Amino acid sequence: MNLTELKRKNSVSIYRCILDGINSTIPIAKTIGLSQLTVCELANEMVAREILDITKPKRNVKGRRIHYFQPSHKFYTAIIDVQKNFICTIGITPSGNVTERFDYPVNYLDKTVQQILSDHVIKKLKNCQSFKYCTSVYVLCDSNDSYDVGEGITVTTKERLIVDAIAHKDKAMLFEFNGKCLVSLYSHVYQPKVSKDELIKAIPFDEFRCYDGDLFEIFIDSIQRIATKRLEDVI
């Protein structure tokens, strides 16, 4: 059975496996008759290639209509890759299914990512229509990229993001790996059905792990845990 057939016949179980984390693979593997290793490999491949593959914009993206997530969805996440000037948004249902994904360049935003980072991160993200329904926002950038903040003062991306988060008295988590900076701004955007406190409780960032190799592999673990970990208790 190839990956396409497996997804079609067992999409709920496989996506549940992906989003629940690696410990879920044993019972799911037994249920659908696969080994734990096979399920793990499929989960990694599906997440890396289908859910989080934001390395290239889609063809003919210029001028096409951007469809925003519908309020019926219960979880939304956005990933910003500063270096590639690209954004990926993902919609996830309460059952753990990844139902929608839209990729588009940052020129669809009100301002470029660079401008957002250098001018009050939280305020700009809140005001971006693209993030209207997102409960989770990640910013990927080079840790030592410099920005002129005026009066002859230059700060790195990491420093600026930390300062913005502290200044707005909001939650932010920052991780560094291989000269890259991953900042989670998960409570900075509007989502009407989940309160800030409930959302924070639902996101176990202490379980975050980084991987060597491809940059986007870091999301395999974080997204799968964030998406469904205790989510049913939150909604």
Where are these regions (language model features)?
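Gly/Thr-rich phosphate-binding beta-strand-loop-beta motif of the actin/hexokinase/Hsp70
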Residues: 63-100, 171-188
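C-terminal regulatory/effector modules of DNA-binding transcriptional regulators
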Residues: 98-235
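Residue-level marker for well-ordered alpha-helical positions
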Residues: 12, 40, 159-160
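Extreme N-terminal segment that seeds HTH/winged-HTH DNA-binding domains in transcriptional regulators
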Residues: 1-29
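A short, glycine- and basic residue-enriched loop/turn
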Residues: 58-60
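Short connector loops/turns at beta-strand edges and beta->alpha or beta->beta junctions
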Residues: 17-20, 94-97, 144
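N-terminal helix-turn-helix
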Residues: 20-54, 64
